[in-house]
Structures are given as structure tokens and as C-alpha cells.
Amino acid sequence: MCAQQGVSLYRRYLNAGIMEEGLVSPRTQGVPQGSPLSPLLSNVMLTELDWEIESRGLSHVRYADDCNIYVKSEKAAQRVLNSITQYVEGELKLRVNRDKSGTFRPKDSTFLGYTFSKADSKRIVVAEKSMKRLWTKLHKMFNSARGTSLKKTIERLTPVLRGWRNYYRLDTRKQFWNEMDERIRHHLRELIWIAWKRPKTRAQNLIKLGLDLETAWKSSVNGRGAWWNSGQAHMNLTIKNARFARLGLYSLRFMAIC
């Protein structure tokens, strides 16, 4: 696509109407939030900002209108923030959102779901907010999976886990991904324990899966909750990791980029 075709496509998109209750009304200003045109227009408008930052010898990263600039001290950060704000508003005639702008230590900032490790400032890792969003989604999936077959539950988990892992592939902490895998399997074992319902059924299934008679019965009537039991030896020894792997559970530790 040549430049003229690109400009023509942008203009057609900007002039497109807005669908409201089945009717198209004209758009007088702005771009639909979340549309693919937003980051493209941001790049058109902010390429000069990239050049300005690079001409000052500063390290930076930008996605659409979200930009981080890295300097060596808090004093330098404040100076750069002020001068870049003046440049954007004075030269580019754009407004800087001061509520979202500021100076931060790298380990306290988040960019596109990543942050810097507190233990190793040169390593980028998954941000805490990103983790919380994922587990909120997974908890809803696990709660709605009660009464559903294990295979079906794993099939529903797979695209979520694969997509999340591929996006956060720059986080290379082996222990972190191992712990994530373990926690997911813990939830799946909990679903199995809940599905067995009665102590007698639990004991019978544990025995079928290789646990000795005495341990199986003691485990089935211990009076503890499903989450506690699903993390104990009687479940880890009988519901092995290999079983989940055979059913197609996606491993965050041993990722395959798709």
C-alpha cells in the first residue's frame, strides 16, 4: 500500500458513521475507542516525538500514545518530563494527560502489562496487575466448571493460557511459570475432589488410583475443605501431572509459541 492509499483509507475510516440502535449517524469528531485506527494515527502524530527523544540521546519505548522514557536519576526524570510536555503541547499541539503522567522508579511502573523485577532491575517481568486480572478470569472459569468434565474444562483453559503465555514470553523466570502451572493443577484437583462429593466415593476413587486402603479412607474423612485436600499427597500421588498433560493441559513452563 502506497502512502496515498493509506491516507485515503484513514480518511474513509474517519468519515465513517456511528452505528447507534441500528441507525447510522455521522461522526463529527474523534476516533472510536479501541479501533485499529487509533494506534496508527498515534504513530503518525507521534513519530516526531520519537525523533525528538532520540535526538536527546534518551532511551525510550512507545506504544501508540503510551510512552516511557528512562533516565538515571529522579531529578533528570522531572526535568525530562517538563521539557517533553512542553514539546508535545507547544510543538505538536497535543494535550498531555497530567493525571497519567509522572516520574517513577522502573520497578514501580507498568508498561503494556510488564514491569521491572525488584530483584533484578534489568529483567522485565509480568506486572502484578496483569497477574490479578488473569487470576480473576481463571477463578471465574474454575467456579463455572463445577459439574463439567475435566477434559472440557481444560479445553476452555487452553486458549486463555496459551494467549497469555505468548504475550508474556519476555518474562523468563522458570520458577514463576512453574508455580503458575502448579497453582492451575491445584485448582483442577480441587474440581475433581468436589466432583467426588461423598467420602465413600472419594475413598473408592483414591483406592482405584493406587492409594492404599487405610490412607484412602483417612484422607476421605479428614473433614478438611476441598482446596486443602487438593493440595495434599493423597491427591498429588493419585491425580498425576501426566494425566492433565494427556488431556491437553497447556503448560506455561514449557510454552510453545503459536
Question: Which residues are covered by each model-predicted region?
Answer:
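A conserved non-catalytic segment of reverse transcriptases
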Residues: 15, 87, 91-156, 160-162
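A glycine-rich phosphate-binding loop feature that marks nucleotide/adenosyl-phosphate handling sites
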Residues: 101-109, 156-160, 177-185, 200-209
